């Protein structure tokens, strides 16, 4: 059976979305950032809504809603200029085998050369655990979400 491109998830739908993304790449050039956002089942917004004995697997509606809201906030930060002047993006949301959503996002920024500079990247990317004595609340949160 051949399904039309208007049916979400069909082969023609995927091909259409792929062609749209390629057209954007042709117009905008190479993307500047590739961001992956993964849902964390320990987010307080999720755990606060679960009843005693429930896990995130029991409430995929809550997990999806919280993830979508956090993704919307991330997009608002990019579009608002938190990471430089925004020019465009393409994203895809998938569900892992564990049932948790994650998004793959490519961004184009208006200043095409800014993201080639180490200083620009270092301003927004941090890969260190906060100091336990001077930034205790950040340390606790990072340690809690890591394990």
Residue ranges and their predicted role:
Residues 1-147:
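Extended, structured polyanion-binding interfaces
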């Amino acid at each position: 059976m051949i399904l039309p491109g208007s049916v979400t998830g069909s082969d023609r739908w995927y091909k259409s979305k792929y062609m749209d993304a390629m057209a954007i790449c042709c117009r905008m050039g190479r993307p500047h950032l590739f961001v992956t956002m993964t849902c964390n089942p320990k987010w307080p917004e999720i755990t606060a809504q679960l009843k005693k004995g429930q896990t995130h697997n029991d409430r995929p509606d809550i997990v999806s809603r919280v993830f979508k809201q956090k993704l919307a906030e991330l997009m608002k930060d990019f579009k608002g200029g938190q990471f430089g002047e925004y020019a465009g993006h393409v994203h895809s949301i998938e569900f892992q085998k564990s049932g948790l959503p994650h998004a793959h996002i490519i961004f184009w920024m208006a200043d095409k050369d800014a993201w080639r500079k180490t200083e620009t990247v270092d301003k927004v990317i941090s890969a260190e655990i906060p100091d336990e004595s001077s930034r205790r609340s950040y340390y606790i949160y990072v340690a809690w979400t890591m394990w």
